[in-house]
UniProtKB/Swiss-Prot annotation:
Organism in which the protein naturally occurs: Drosophila willistoni
Gene Ontology MF annotations: DNA binding; transcription coregulator activity
Pfam families assigned to the protein according to its UniProt record, in alphabetical order: AFF4_CHD
The protein's name in its UniProt record: AF4/FMR2 family member lilli
Ranges of Low complexity composition bias in the record: 16-25, 162-179, 187-200, 247-264, 509-529, 542-552, 564-583, 815-837, 927-951, 961-1013, 1034-1049, 1056-1091, 1130-1139, 1157-1173, 1189-1212, 1267-1276, 1727-1747
GO BP term, example: periodic partitioning by pair rule gene
Gene: lilli
Keywords in alphabetical order: Developmental protein, DNA-binding, Nucleus, Pair-rule protein, Phosphoprotein, Transcription, Transcription regulation
Basic residues composition bias: residue spans: 553-563, 892-902, 1373-1386
Disulfide pattern: none
């Protein structure tokens, strides 16, 4: 047992041991396995670590190499890189953004470049988005990746967003590496990697190492340096909504993490930055497959979202990302275009890439929609303080694009949202403009950086502005250079100031707030950068943001709440900025209040783009004028709307942005404005399209653009498609309108409030102004009918809104610079409110400009249709001129007008927008001139001098000055000079300067515009207060004189041009004044201008009709008084350019106290305007010196005919009228009726024009208007021409429909009750149009028919003066008759308006040309009629009566009648014109029409001169006819002399073809008719009109030719002189050709063929024989070369003839051969014998002598056919080869002139020429050559 137990124990022990051993073994084995696994893992880890280290080392080495390379580069290259880097930093451009992009761009291009941005801006955003969301390249690390902002970012660029998904500390590259590593090692390795990367010295680059302190005090300058990303709240944006940044926000941490991660795997390549700080598109050697997964590290890793690592938190589903990407792409691209355009002052939404106006629409996707989607897009990441760093990107678009890299630094929950928020923040931080752009750019940025909900933008702008306004840099993508220029950093850059085009485009800012944001801020930056730079930027941002918000609001209801929030923020910012502006400029407060008021409207989409509302609100804030933002806003941004009033002024209206308010703004910023003014010209230039593209593009405006008011909310200011301005009737709008009216007064008073208000109104009006006549029509277009017609641009055309302003608009758009600038310039100059209006960008075709205070209907003027506008412009030139100023309201004129004039002086910046060259100087001059104008008496020659002065200061000059300018320079010259000057940069000058007559027409438009605008504004002011209303009238009238001056120029020009000018004036005046009142005045003024008696005469006609109906004497006395007073003032201040302009205006337009009104006194000016209107009737005699000038100008306008007729009657009548005008001046309360009328018109309850949607502006005081309004309401309701009756009813004051319209609009602006005048629009429009056109025509006709006295007796300076003070009815009758006669003579003379009998004077405006051609033709007809009238002076009046009655009977019927008459007459007129002045026809239609107008005006003036012995007619090359009434006497004569001298210069501008000539008395007609010999006209004939030759078939004839040929050949054989020999040979060849040609008809084909073939051989022999002579260096070389060319032509034609003779055979051969080759007939042979193709038949079996290659057997007939075919086709080939050879010889030998002469004399020789033509051509050429050889001096080449 014991043993057993022992054994068992032992056994157990053994078992135990065995078990232990087994366990040990198992343990050991397991340990070994573990060890092996561990070792393997360790090895793997080591390998991976080594790989990572190697990659990092490689990347580091690569970076170091790059760095060393960079520093080893040549000094020049380094310096260039540094400069570029600095430039990019300054502009907020991320070089890495550009270079790391998927599509690398040439280094030489910088996205910041304006042109490149315009061309690629959209592309840049799209590229950024693609890089970030699709390819994974993230220039903006945080923004690039939706989840992992940091993975794909260039560490240097910005610390990539720490991968929030994985760990805050792990960089995106680390996450990528971890994803490659085993799951267990991923995080550790990532951490290690991150640590290593952080520890590793960052590759030396220009980027400042992240130290939580962005370079340049947080402004961030290095492309890769994060912009204060570590400061979460620095941006002032709401905290980011996305997951919190894992890495500390500190830029150093973010940068380090991003840098380390990117450097390890992807970072270095992605962010590889050249030492210059710019990232290289090449990221360096691929570190690993992982690094390359992204494309060799070239593209930023999509961030873990797109490629989640094993250890990294999975990103959101890719599908979702893809969908979001697609939606973002779609939204962004739509929105993104806005961002670049946001840089432009226009509505950023649509015109992001407005950097160059032409590109405005190229790259804009419906930005409004995209913005809304962005807003709608979830604000996954609200921009946090990080966003603020982005703020440095100033340019709205560029910042967004650039922001993404910075945004990538931001710890945004969602990259996309983050990027957008960042960009928005950075934008807002950068500037208000940037913020505004950021709102748009926010969308773009969202695309680039990620979808950043725009919702973030609203929060971002406030903080961003406060946090980084200075830091904000424009991004490359954006128009940063422009914004940069605002900062004055970019001023040196080529973006804005470098190129006038860009500056003009930027200058569009006056035209559109969106555009203006960058460009305006740039302007303000360069001009008043220090003063309002930040404010300006903020304002721009606010404006842009508001615009974007509005757009979003209008287009994306979903984000409406968000938009509201943004708007609130923007409003707060604007308020703050406005406060700053207030500090900066006097108008700041007003602007601010106006902004608040306009903000509501601005929110509306219409204002957004139209620059009325949004522009107005932001503009008011930013540009010291509501107009500043949208219209002035744009302008104001350009003017540095932030600058305050100055900013507003500074941009072409940026003022104008101040507009009137810009005026206020301009005036408050008057000084700053001066600076801005310099850039303003470019804005004006840009205005031409700025307005169109700003207003075309804006989505919000698009809705406003709807033809029907239904589309455009009447509560939302906007521009209807027709160009009518919608002035909301809402309380806010009313307030704005009231403010505007006040602004008119204040402008006269130079009140900041009024300036601001004016800016609001003016902004919108200014937009219209920008469109040339759009503004003018705005008031007119108020009528709802027009809203529908606006789209067609024909609805208004009717008597209602027949506004030539539309025509003008098209004119202006065509000649954007010339007409538009002129209009805006005029508006701005004439009225400070108008000047603000100038800033208001006119909507593009189909767009509506919304004026906050004006009812939508009022604004629904057809601005958009440029073509229609052009047509209307000519016929309705006057139409645009509102009648508002006409009613004599001495009280307002004296007081308010003066202030307004002062505002006008301040307004010069607005003018500046039109005149780029002399904006600030003009501005100063304007102010001084205004001051002086009051003192300076109007010298008779002033008008002449003024034209030059005006030209100099046209731009900066306020409307007053502009009026004065036009009037001052002999009206035409002043109008063309002043208007051109004003439009110097942009509108008027461009199109109209081509032909000075066009320029004069433009000038007239401008002048009218100015005149109208002052009226408008003055009328507005007047409507506000009784005294004011007359003042407004005066202002308008002074404008009218300016317009008249321009009209005078136009008179010489065809009425169409005058009409166009009037339209320009009308549109500008309309824009400047309340839209409604402006329109009326514009029309009146325009009418005057087109009449060519100068606006004064036209105004007189209208005023006389309206004012005379109302006590003409009462109105005239004050007017005359004012006129004389202003005359004195104007004269006294001739030294100052403004003063000079003023007094010339005064002189030119006696009736135009305008000159004086504009320049001399605001109050006095307004009064003078009214007085001038009356004076035109009564004053001409009173102020003969002024009258002569005025007369001359007026003659250009419609005053010509009425000038002569009223010449004698005006002497006595003028003095009385002048006295009456003076009396009226003394009766400031005489405008009570006017005020009441306006009030009623604007009161909805009263059923006035407002209810009707028509704005009737009466020239009377507001009291009078109110009294008359009741009457007018009925009349107006019936038709748009009631104002005449109202005027007659108004008692002492003459009410013009046009003035009524202005007054109504102004009244609406002045009094909230009147604010709602939507219905007034149509009424006003109708009245203005008919009145203007008829008035002008009447005057022209009157000049011819009535020698001394006419009912319409034109007051030489003042316009038509009824002889004894004829009743308005009589005057209107005369006008009607004249107009009708004019129409008949012109065949409906482009006045399709249907006048209504009640509104005779007003009804004239109804006539408007259907098109420019029609007007041109009508004018020609009128010329013929005038000639008849000269023979039979008494006949025309009856005709006129007949026509007037017919026209007044029914507008539609009359239109139809006119059309019927016009169609045949147009043809006749055309033929006549061609016959009479074929050479005078300008190159283009517009010029041609202008010339026609000029001609017609000349004829009218001549007729008038012939008719009126008392009137002295001075015809200058300008085509200006200066009529001096006998009253003028010596003074008149003196004035005439200087005027005639000045007129020629102006005239030359207007009509280049007419040499300056001055004639007086009877000589005038001859000089008028006499014109320089027309240049040779090119005659083109149809190919089928060739002469059909019927050569004799007589064989004897061919024999005769043959004998001649043989004789010459034999003579040539014996000739020794080489030249004679060659010519004889060639003659022989010509006769041989004639012989062969005759043989074709009588001989066999073979004989003919032989003859041609032999002839070809002969000529070839001759050519070869004389070829050496062609190469000789002697004097005969050229002659031999010419002979050789003739020879080659002959050879070519003979070759072609040989082919034609065999064409039938050739066709048969071709068919046979085609059949042969198609069927494959013929045997294939290897050798000589036909056989199979077997190898046996190859060389071996063939004979040794047979080396024929294998081929196909061709039958003999086929071979013969091939030979024949070759022969025939060779002829064809030779024919063309020889012909081309001859052509080359012609060019290389410089013989073009010689052969051109031959072609002109003998018809061109072509391959279709017959042999007879060849013979004639060759004989003529040889004869010329012989003559040249015989008479070398006459040798022609």
């Amino acid at each position: 047992m014991a043993q057993q137990q022992q054994q068992q124990q032992h056994h157990h022990h053994l078992q135990h041991q065995q078990q232990q051993q087994q366990q040990q073994q198992l343990q050991h084995h397991s340990n070994l396995l573990l060890l092996q696994q561990q070792q393997q893992q360790q090895q793997q880890q080591q390998q991976q670590q080594q790989q990572l280290l190697q990659q990092e080392q490689q990347l580091q080495q690569y970076d170091n190499n790059l760095y060393s390379q960079n520093y080893n580069m040549e000094e020049y290259e380094r310096r260039r890189r540094r400069e570029r880097e600095k430039y990019e930093r300054q502009q907020g451009i991320q070089s890495d953004d550009r270079e790391t992009s998927l599509f690398s761009e040439p280094r030489r291009l910088t996205e910041g470049d304006a042109e490149i941005t315009a061309a690629l801006g959209e592309f840049g955003d799209a590229r950024n988005y693609i890089n970030q969301y699709t390819v994974g390249i993230s220039r903006h690390a945080p923004g690039g990746g939706s989840g992992n902002g940091s993975i794909g970012n260039n560490p240097r660029l910005q610390a990539p967003m720490i991968q929030q998904q994985v760990s805050s500390s792990i960089s995106s590259s680390a996450s990528v590496a971890s994803s490659l590593l085993p799951p267990g090692l991923g995080q550790t390795q990532q951490q290690q990697q991150q640590q290593q990367q952080q520890q590793q010295p960052r590759p030396p680059t220009y980027l400042k190492q992240a130290d939580n302190k962005p370079p340049y005090n947080g402004r961030g300058g290095y492309p890769g340096q994060p912009m204060k990303n570590d400061i979460p709240s620095s941006s002032g944006m709401a905290p980011p909504r996305g997951p919190p940044k894992l890495n500390s926000n500190s830029s150093s941490i973010t940068n380090n993490a991003a840098a380390s991660s990117s450097s390890s795997l992807l970072g270095p390549p992605i962010s590889t930055q050249v030492p210059n700080g710019r990232e290289k598109s090449f990221l360096g050697p691929p570190t690993t497959g992982t690094a390359l997964h992204n494309g060799g590290g070239r593209f930023a890793q999509p961030v873990s979202n797109k490629r989640p690592g094993v250890g990294i938190q999975p990103p959101p589903p890719q599908e979702k990302d893809v969908r979001s990407m697609l939606s973002e792409m779609k939204n962004h691209f739509q929105v993104t275009p806005l961002n670049p355009i946001a840089a432009t002052p226009q509505a950023p939404t649509r015109e992001n890439y407005n950097l160059n106006a032409p590109n405005k629409f190229k790259y804009a996707f419906d930005i409004v929609d995209p913005i809304m989607p962005l807003l709608n897009s979830p604000p996954s990441v609200t921009p946090s303080s990080l966003i603020t760093p982005i703020a440095p990107m100033t340019s709205p678009i560029a910042p967004l694009l650039t922001t993404p890299p910075q945004a990538s630094q931001l710890p945004l929950g969602s990259g996309s949202g983050n990027g957008a928020a960042i960009s928005a923040t950075s934008l807002s931080t950068t500037t208000a403009a940037a913020a505004a752009a950021a709102a748009v750019a926010g969308v773009a940025a969202t695309v680039a950086a990620t979808v950043a909900p725009i919702q973030q933008l609203p929060p971002t702008p406030p903080k961003a502005m406060s946090v980084t306004p200075p830091t904000a840099k424009p991004l490359k993508i954006e128009k940063n250079p422009i914004l940069e220029k605002q900062d004055s950093c970019l001023e040196n850059d080529l973006e804005l100031s470098e190129s006038e085009d860009e500056r003009k485009k930027d200058g569009r800012s006056p035209g559109s707030s969106s555009n203006g944001s960058e460009s305006d801020s740039t302007e303000s930056g360069s001009e008043s950068s220090s003063k309002g730079e930040h404010n300006h930027h903020h304002h721009h941002q606010q404006q842009q943001q508001q615009t974007q918000q509005q757009q979003l609001h209008g287009h994306h209801p979903q984000s409406h709440h968000h938009q509201q929030f943004l708007q609130q923020q923007l409003q707060r910012q604007q308020q703050q900025q406005q406060q700053q502006q207030q500090l900066t400029a006097n108008g700041g407060k007003k602007k601010y209040s106006q902004t608040i008021i306009a903000s509501g409207a601005n929110t509306i989409t219409g204002l957004l783009t139209s620059s009325g509302g949004l522009g107005s609100s932001s503009g008011n804030n930013s540009s010291g004028g509501g107009g500043g933002s949208g219209n002035g806003g744009t302008t104001s941004s350009s003017s540095g709307g932030s600058m305050g009033g100055s900013g507003g002024s500074s941009s072409s209206g940026g003022a104008s942005g101040g507009g009137g308010g810009g005026g206020g703004s301009g005036s408050s910023s008057g000084i700053g404005s001066g600076s801005s003014s310099n850039k303003t010209p470019s804005p004006t230039d840009s205005n031409k399209w700025n307005l169109s593209r700003f207003f075309h593009k804006p989505t919000s405006q698009t809705s406003s653009e709807s033809v029907s008011p239904g589309n455009v909310s009447m509560k939302v200011p906007g521009i209807l498609p027709g160009g009518a301005q919608i002035i909301p009737e809402s309380i806010d709008v009313t307030t704005a309108i009231v403010k505007n009216e006040k602004i008119h007064h204040d402008d006269h008073l130079m009140d900041i409030d009024e300036c601001d208000e004016d800016d609001d109104d003016v902004d919108e009006q200014h937009q219209q102004l920008r469109y040339g006549a759009g503004l003018s029509v705005t008031p007119v277009a108020v009528k709802k009918e027009e809203d529908l017609g606006l789209l067609t641009a024909a609805a208004i055309p009717k008597s209602q809104i027949k506004r030539e302003s539309e025509t003008q608009i098209s004119h202006q758009r065509l000649s954007e610079s010339a007409t538009s600038g002129s209009s805006s310039s005029s508006c701005s100059s004439s009225d400070s409110a108008a000047s603000a209006s100038e800033v208001v960008p006119m909507p593009g075709p189909g767009e509506t400009l919304q004026i906050p205070g004006v009812p939508a209907a009022i604004t629904s003027v057809m601005r958009v249709p440029p073509i229609n506008n052009m047509q209307k412009s000519q016929s309705m030139s006057v139409t645009v001129t509102p009648i508002a100023p006409l009613p004599a309201s001495p009280k307002p004129r004296q007081k308010k007008p003066r202030k307004k004039k002062m505002m006008s002086v301040l307004t010069p910046p607005l003018l500046d927008s039109s005149d780029e060259d002399e904006p600030s100087t003009k501005h100063s001059s304007l102010v001084v001139a205004q001051a002086q104008a009051a003192v300076v008496p109007p010298p008779s020659t002033n008008s002449t001098t003024t034209s030059a002065t005006t030209t100099k200061k046209g731009r900066g000059r306020p409307r007053k000055q502009q009026q004065q300018q036009s009037a001052g320079s002999g009206n035409l010259s002043s109008a063309s000079a002043g208007s051109s000057s004003q439009a110097k940069g942009p509108t008027l000058t461009a199109a109209k300067k081509t032909l000075v007559k066009a320029s004069a027409s433009s000038s007239t438009s401008n002048t009218n515009s100015s005149s109208v605008l002052p009226r408008k504004r003055e009328h507005s002011s007047q409507s506000s207060s009784n005294g004011n209303t007359p003042t407004k009238k005066m202002s308008s009238i002074p404008m009218m004189p300016a317009a008249a001056a321009s009209a005078a120029a136009t008179l010489l020009q065809p009425p169409a041009v005058a009409a166009a000018n009037a339209v320009a004036a009308s549109s500008s005046s309309s824009d400047e004044e309340s839209s409604s009142s402006s329109c009326s005045t514009s029309k009146s003024s325009s009418s005057s201008s087109s009449s060519d008696d100068t606006e004064t005469q036209k105004t007189n006609c209208r005023i006389v009709k309206l004012n005379k109906t109302v006590p003409v004497t009462a109105a005239m006395a004050p007017l005359a008084k004012r006129s004389s007073y202003h005359r004195r003032s104007g004269s006294s201040s001739p030294t100052s350019s403004s003063s000079e302009t003023d007094k010339p205006n005064s002189n030119s337009h006696n009736n135009l106290g305008i000159a004086a009104i504009s320049n001399s006194n605001s109050n006095s000016n307004n009064n003078v305007i009214v007085n001038n209107n009356l004076q035109q009737q009564a004053m001409p005699q009173q102020s003969p010196y002024k009258v002569p000038l005025s007369g001359g100008s007026q003659q250009l306008s419609s005053s010509d005919s009425s000038s002569s007729s009223s010449g004698s009657s005006s002497s006595s009548g003028d003095e009385d009228d002048a006295k009456r005008e003076k009396n009226r001046e003394r009766k400031p309360k005489s405008d009570k009726n006017k005020i009441s009328t306006l009030t009623r018109i604007f009161n909805n309850k009263e059923g006035g024009a407002k209810k009707q949607g028509q704005v009737v502006i009466i020239d009377q005081s507001e009291e009078q208007l109110q009294q008359q309004q009741q009457q007018q309401q009925q009349v107006q309701i019936r038709d748009p021409l009631p104002p005449p009756s109202l005027l007659s009813q108004s008692g002492g004051v003459k009410q013009r429909m046009t003035p009524t319209q202005q007054q109504q609009l102004g009244a609406g602006l002045a009094s909230p009750a009147r604010t709602t005048t939507p219905l007034l629009t149509s009424l006003i429009c109708k009245i203005d149009l008919s009145k203007l056109s008829r008035e002008r025509i009447l005057r022209l006709k009157k000049l011819a028919p009535s020698s001394s006295n006419q009912q319409n007796g034109h007051l030489t300076p003042n316009g038509h003066v009824v002889q004894g003070g004829s009743s308005p009815a009589g005057l209107s009758k005369v006008k009607h008759e004249h107009h009708q006669l004019h129409h008949h003579s012109q065949q409906a003379h482009s006045h399709p308006v249907k006048p209504e009998p009640e509104l005779d004077s007003l009804y004239e405006t109804k006539f408007r040309p259907t098109n420019v051609k029609q007007e041109f033709q009508l004018k020609q007809e009128r010329d013929r009629d005038r000639n008849r009238e000269r023979d039979q002076q008494q006949q025309p009046p009856p005709r006129r009566r007949k026509r007037s009655s017919s026209s007044s009977s029914s507008p539609y019927k009359e239109k139809k009648r006119k059309k019927e008459k016009t169609d045949p007459m147009l043809t006749n007129a055309k033929d006549q014109m061609l016959q009479i002045n074929p050479m005078l026809l300008p190159s283009n239609n517009h010029e041609r029409l202008s010339y026609d107008k000029y001609q017609l005006l000349q004829e009218d003036a001549a007729a008038a001169a012939a008719a009126a012995a008392a009137v002295a007619v001075v015809n200058s090359s300008n085509g200006q006819k200066l009529f001096q009434s006998s009253i003028g006497g010596g003074t008149g004569a003196t004035a005439v002399g200087p005027l005639s001298i000045m007129a020629p210069s102006t005239c030359s501008e207007a009509v280049q073809t007419t040499p300056p000539t001055s004639v007086t008395g009877a000589g005038a007609p001859a000089s008028l008719v006499s014109q320089p010999p027309p240049p040779p006209r090119l005659i083109y004939r149809s190919y089928f009109d060739r002469e059909e030759e019927h050569p004799s078939d007589d064989l004897r004839k061919s024999k005769q030719f043959l004998q001649e040929a043989v004789q010459r050949k034999h003579a040539a054989d014996s000739e020794r002189d080489s030249f004679n020999q060659v010519t004889l040979y060639l003659e022989a060849v010509a006769y041989f050709l004639l012989t062969a040609d005759a043989m074709e008809r009588c001989s066999s084909e073979t004989a003919t063929w032989t003859m041609y073939k032999d002839t070809l051989s002969l000529i070839k022999f001759i050519s070869s024989k004389f070829r050496p002579y062609q190469q000789s260096a002697n004097c005969q070389q050229e002659t031999h070369n010419k002979v050789a060319i003739l020879s080659l032509r002959c050879q070519s034609l003979i070759s072609l003839k040989l082919f034609k003779l065999r064409r039938v055979n050739c066709r048969a051969i071709i068919n046979s051969l085609t059949d042969f080759f198609r069927n494959g007939r013929g045997d294939i042979v290897n050798g000589n014998t036909p056989s199979s193709i077997s190898p046996s038949n190859s060389v071996g079996s063939q004979g040794s002598g047979s080396n024929t290659p294998p081929g196909k057997i061709v039958p003999q007939d086929i071979h013969n056919q091939l030979c024949k075919q070759n022969e025939y086709l060779t002829y064809v080939n030779s024919a063309h080869e020889l012909w081309d050879q001859a052509d080359r010889l012609v060019r290389t030998g410089n013989h073009l002139d010689f052969f051109r002469e031959l072609d002109h004399e003998n018809g061109p020789l072509t391959l279709h020429s017959t042999m007879h033509e060849v013979f004639r051509y060759v004989q003529a050429g040889l004869k010329t050559l012989r003559d040249a050889v015989s008479h070398p001096t006459h040798q022609s080449q």
